[in-house]
Regions:
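Regulatory and interdomain segments flanking nucleotide-handling catalytic cores
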Residues: 1-4, 11-250
Length: 250
């Protein structure tokens, strides 16, 4: 179907389908935060590992020691399974990815059969399903150092695509000639991305990044009686996370 074509052509639209063009642009903008390999050896190691590198190995408190050991999330697992990063890589990573994908398909079919008729509920469950299954695997490893999860890349790609679509529909309302103008504008953006040196500041003012900072909450979190402290801390942590998600959504 159309969704399959949009996903399949996310690296480059096959024609002038608006959604394909928007997702392709969003994918490229979202991938702009990937860290390039520093050496040829790093690239060769990363291409064979295919696992997400823990960002904690980049934390260097001793400025004299520039060398750090990379640690990997050894198995691609679901979010509800606790697993720490390790120095050794998994020798059966391809098989583990296949198992994870089969489990994802099974879970997807289940939520689709239960909530497929309600688009809002289905989108809600699909969002968390994808997070659950992709938070621990790299978005790319062939050409980039795999420190960005597939979940983070997918989420920002979707956010950029939706923002771009909504903004263009406001600028060019209606159908017919308006859609043709949208296509021409998207073609211009794609051509500019192919040669980023031609992009000027504020040339495409379509996005606003809003940063939220919840600080000074230590008193709220730790002002807890010792009796039942564990449950209270979990509850307050959930409340803060839920509050941030709600503010960001609305």
């Amino acid at each position: 179907g159309r969704i399959q074509n949009i996903v399949k052509n996310h690296n480059g639209p096959s024609g002038n389908d608006i959604c394909e063009m928007i997702v392709s642009i969003a994918d490229r903008l979202s991938a702009g935060d990937r860290e390039q390999h520093k050496t040829k050896e790093d690239k060769e190691i990363s291409s064979s590992v295919m696992q997400l590198i823990s960002v904690f190995c980049d934390i260097n408190l001793n400025k004299q020691n520039k060398k750090f050991e990379e640690t990997y999330y050894k198995r691609p697992i679901k979010r509800d399974v606790l697993h720490y990063a390790e120095k050794e890589t998994s020798p059966r990573i391809k098989e583990e990815y296949e198992k994870l994908f089969e489990s994802l398909k099974e879970a997807f079919n289940k939520i689709y059969s239960e909530y497929g008729e309600d688009k809002f509920l289905f989108a809600h469950y699909l969002y968390h399903l994808i997070e659950n299954y992709t938070f621990n695997i790299p978005s790319a490893y062939y050409y980039n150092r795999p420190t960005i999860s597939l979940w983070a890349h997918l989420k920002t790609t979707a956010a950029i695509a939706l923002a771009l679509y909504n903004q263009l529909k406001v600028e060019y309302p209606g159908e017919g000639e308006s859609e043709n103008r949208i296509k021409r504008q998207l073609e211009t953006i794609i051509n500019k991305l192919n040669d980023s040196s031609t992009i000027t500041e504020n040339e495409f003012p379509y996005f606003t990044l809003i940063k939220g900072d919840i600080s000074g909450i230590q008193d709220f979190v730790y002002d807890t009686d010792m009796d039942g402290a564990s449950n209270a801390l979990k509850g307050k942590s959930f409340y803060i996370s839920f509050l941030m998600e709600t503010i960001a959504k609305f």
